[in-house]
């Protein structure tokens, strides 16, 4: 959390940075749950508003799992070490979110898309 704040502080102090022209996306890495990840983000968001007069946009978490720990230990991407790990799947979802320009499926659309993918064995 302190590293993220320090980086944002340096960014906001850079005369070339215009906070009105940029959106800063934040994700919580290695969170035990979505609730924990959101709580960490809320603390960062509060400090950024209070001390930097800025804002950040929450895009979620990368969940902590055994395969992520293993991937970090052997210095390989978790998506290669274990493509089916929770963390790998979340990286994929976040990549799709960013590629789509920040448009997320509603949970109903996402569930239906997953159903069709499994039904027709698409991937």
Where are these regions (language model features)?
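Conserved catalytic-core segment of NTP-binding enzymes
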Residues: 1-60
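Residue-level recognition of oxygen-bearing side chains
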Residues: 6, 67, 86
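A general structural signal for short secondary-structure boundary/capping elements
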Residues: 17, 39-42, 70-76, 104-110
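Short hinge/gating elements
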Residues: 27-29, 74-81
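Phosphate/oxyanion-binding loops and surfaces in catalytic or ligand/nucleic-acid-binding neighborhoods
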Residues: 47, 51, 65, 101
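Beta-strand-loop-alpha "switch" segments that mediate conformational coupling across diverse proteins
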Residues: 52-78, 91
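NTP-binding/hydrolysis catalytic cores, primarily Walker-type P-loop NTPases
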Residues: 77-123
